[in-house]
Amino acid sequence: MSDLVSIIIPYYRKKPFFEKTIDSINSQTYKNFEIILIYDDDNRSDLLFVKKVLKKTKNKKIIVNKKNLGVGISRNRGINKSKGKFISFIDADDVWNRDKLKKQIKFMKKNSLDFSYSDYSIINEKGILIKKIKSPKIIKFKNLLFSCDIALSSVTIRSHLLRSEKFSNIKTKEDYLLWLKLSQKNIKMMGIRENLIFWRKTNNSLSSSIVQKFKDAFLVYNKYLKLNFLVSIVLIFFLSINSIIKRYL
């Protein structure tokens, strides 16, 4: 029997896109998965809608936060409830290729990987393609310091790695920080050179806030990785330039 994959989804006011996200999961050719949805909004107006959409999914858990905790802490709550040998992440407005899990799990087993990711497409709120992004085949800590080339919704990790390392509670770089911490452990990380996800760029997403990105990047380098002020500023500069090149050029 195939290994169980736990799919972690934080939800915060993504009603216009959520059904397409869940449809892309339910249509996966790899069928042995569980969805763990963390409802992270103290406003309960979308909760009935979320439950209705998830009726299509047999194996699921819905966790309702008492208050808004943020995506990092919410994902951690999902990880703690997960049972899968592998854990995959997807944001509540992104979309997967129907063969995403099948190809990724096969790729990880064939190459004895701990962590995998893929190329991805950036789409707008209407689903129109903005740009295709190629991720590097192999990522090491020293390369990751200068450029975050891993889309969260493309990531699948062996679950045992997330028992000791978790997401932080910063607003926009919580995934980047976790990838950095995991890469310091010299785990085997490799990308599939194939586009397996669609990452949705929305006008009101936290990841769209340039000021917030700068603040959180400094926290990643200076507070969490314990790098000095000057080194942190230099790395933020390179991270920003590489992000601009990747997204807009």
What function would you assign to each model-found segment?
Residues 11-27:
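Short, well-formed alpha-helical segments that are part of the catalytic scaffolds
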Residues 22-64:
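Acidic donor-binding segment of Leloir-type glycosyltransferases
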Residues 91-95, 119:
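The conserved acidic donor/metal-binding loop of glycosyltransferases
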Residues 87:
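Short aromatic/hydrophobic "clamp" motif used to bind/position activated sugar donors
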Residues 138-212:
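Conserved nucleotide-sugar donor-binding catalytic segment
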